[in-house]
Curated annotation (Swiss-Prot):
The keyword Metal-binding does not apply. This is Preprofallaxidin-4. Residues 23-46 form a propeptide. Belongs to the frog skin active peptide (FSAP) family. Dermaseptin subfamily. Coiled coil: none annotated. Expressed by the skin glands. Residues 30-42 have a biased composition (Acidic residues). The lineage of its organism: Eukaryota, Metazoa, Chordata, Craniata, Vertebrata. It comes from the Eukaryota.
Amino acid sequence: MASLKKFLFLVLFLGMVSLSICDKEKREGENEEEEEEHEEESEEKRGLFSFLPKVIGVIGPLIHPPS
């Protein structure tokens, strides 16, 4: 009976450790995905802001022609 208790305790302990490791890896994966999404958004914003002055440079003279 004592050996059965030890065996069950060992199985339970190893299962909990395994779950803990899996949860940790899952959280790390989610964090990496969030960082990648944030980087993509930053690149899109930079692209927009680099393009915006060119558009203003073209439209500006059309709206306010030189006198």
